[in-house]
Amino acid sequence: MSGPQDAGVDAITLRGVTHRFGDHLVVDDVDLTVAPGECFGLLGPNGAGKTTTIRLITTLLPVQQGEVLVFGTDVRRKPMVVRRLLGYVPQQLSIEGALTGRENVSWFARLFDVPRRERKDRVAEVLAMVNLDEAADRLAATYSGGMVRRLELAQALVNRPALLVLDEPTVGLDPVARDSVWARVAEMQQRYGMTVLLTTHYMEEAEALCDRVALMHQGAIQALGAPADLQAALGPGSSLEDVFRHYTGSSLTGNERGGLRDVRSTRRTARRLG
């Protein structure tokens, strides 16, 4: 799975991005770059602006102020080009329970104009990739929560995206199902070198998957860096929850505003899952 990898072109670029719903400021002057092949996380509580930010990146919301580029392409000027580069798993379930797993993925293959001669093999490939090949011909309504999430991953991967976007990919799942989804995401990211952008409020998820994270609170990025670097900068034994509280004055479910801090990584964080 590959996409635009031109030297010097970031996978995602946000410059001065601000978004309001009426008088309510939900994204506040965000600057951000994500490198090709990186797994990057937006970590923060509900209402932090994470989902709005990725909806701007995925063209699901109009950019009101600032600039959003995906592999150098402006989302406002060429939204259809950007959409062809993306695989997206939203928070809300995006499967049809009355169809089999295979039929669900096949529908997405047609939606993304996967060539007809390739569809059967491509669908089988991504179902096997997420360990659903043996359950592919069961109705999706019979799937567990973890299987549903893995099916959604297969749907998002069938067009071989350059950028995979995951909005709270394991919210509501039990620990076993959560670990299974984490393992599939890490395996696919490592195998194909695709860029992954995810939102989460689970610090364990950020630590398990992300090369770097941006801590978001009240629409703004409060700190940015590799999880290990952010923790080390605060002190031995610090967790990402501690880091978040330090920079924002709040917990991952709190709402008090903190200051901006940027901790740069000098190395890629080692994968915790493989």
Each PLM stretch: what is its role?
Residues 106, 110, 117-135:
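Conserved ABC ATPase "signature" region
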Residues 139-143:
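Conserved ABC ATPase signature
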Residues 160:
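Conserved catalytic motifs of ABC-family nucleotide-binding domains
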Residues 224-225:
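ABC ATPase "signature
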Residues 164-167:
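Catalytic Walker B motif of ABC-type/P-loop ATPase nucleotide-binding domains
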Residues 179-192:
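Helical segment within the ABC ATPase nucleotide-binding domain
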